[in-house]
């Protein structure tokens, strides 16, 4: 949450819409193993029964993390919403989340639509985020530079990019963040903490 907290210091945030793309290691050590086993089996033309996830995760995304909790939202989505309000000390903040499991070993990503009371320009948002402790701005679409899980794994920073005006709201910004959920927990960024070995550890063990 360090990235959006930097914006909140400049103009109070009124609402957040977040879509979280969570790595398989967020489900524990068995997540990456199941992903790799499925990739290997499918390469041989075989099918294996998923045990960690509800469905095959290889070459797939699963739009459910946790059980059904409230009015169509999952427990993970409610957790993310409630933690955001608590950490930012904004109990009335309007937050809506969708959490998706993706076939990435490590490092969660989140797409944000942040609406503030007063308009924050894209350039001002970049300045605020670049100066925020724990953040690294990687935002150069013309040169294909933006945060990706492959580049943010095993890093202590939250990487932020794709900052642009939201076309549905005068005071909205669209933001993309990536962070290693092992190194940076929910108390300091938009990712949820869950310890697991790194991709290199899994590769070396096979």
Residue ranges and their predicted role:
Residues 1-128:
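Active-site-lining helix/loop region of Rossmann-like oxidoreductase modules
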Residues 103, 179-184:
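Glycine-rich phosphate/pyrophosphate-binding beta-alpha loops
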Residues 124, 129-139:
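A common structural junction motif
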Residues 148-170:
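FAD-binding beta-loop-beta segment adjacent to the flavin cofactor pocket
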Residues 173-177:
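Short FAD-binding loop at a beta-strand-to-alpha-helix junction that anchors the flavin cofactor
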Residues 184, 192-193:
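Flexible, small-/acidic-enriched active-site or ligand-binding loops
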Residues 194-199:
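Conserved small/polar residues in nucleotide/adenosyl-binding loops
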Residues 205-206:
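Hydrophobic alpha-helical segments, chiefly the membrane-spanning helices
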């Amino acid at each position: 949450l360090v990235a959006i907290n930097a914006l909140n210091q400049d103009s109070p945030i009124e609402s957040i819409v977040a879509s979280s793309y969570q790595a398989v290691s967020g489900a524990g050590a068995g997540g990456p193993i199941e992903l790799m086993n499925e990739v290997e089996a499918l390469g041989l033309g075989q099918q294996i029964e998923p045990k960690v996830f509800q469905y095959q995760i290889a070459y797939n995304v699963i739009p459910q993390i946790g059980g059904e909790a409230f009015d169509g939202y999952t427990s993970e989505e409610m957790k993310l919403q409630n933690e955001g309000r608590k950490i930012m000390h904004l109990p009335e903040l309007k937050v809506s989340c969708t959490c998706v499991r993706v076939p990435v070993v490590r490092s969660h990503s989140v797409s944000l639509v942040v609406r503030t009371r007063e308009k924050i320009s894209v350039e001002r948002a970049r300045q605020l985020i670049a100066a925020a402790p724990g953040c690294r701005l990687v935002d150069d679409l013309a040169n294909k530079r933006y945060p990706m899980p492959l580049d943010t794994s095993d890093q202590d920073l939250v990487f932020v990019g794709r900052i642009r005006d939201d076309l549905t709201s005068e005071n909205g910004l669209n933001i993309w963040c990536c962070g290693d959920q092992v190194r940076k927990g929910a108390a300091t960024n938009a990712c949820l903490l869950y310890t697991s070995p790194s991709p290199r550890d899994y590769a070396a063990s096979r």
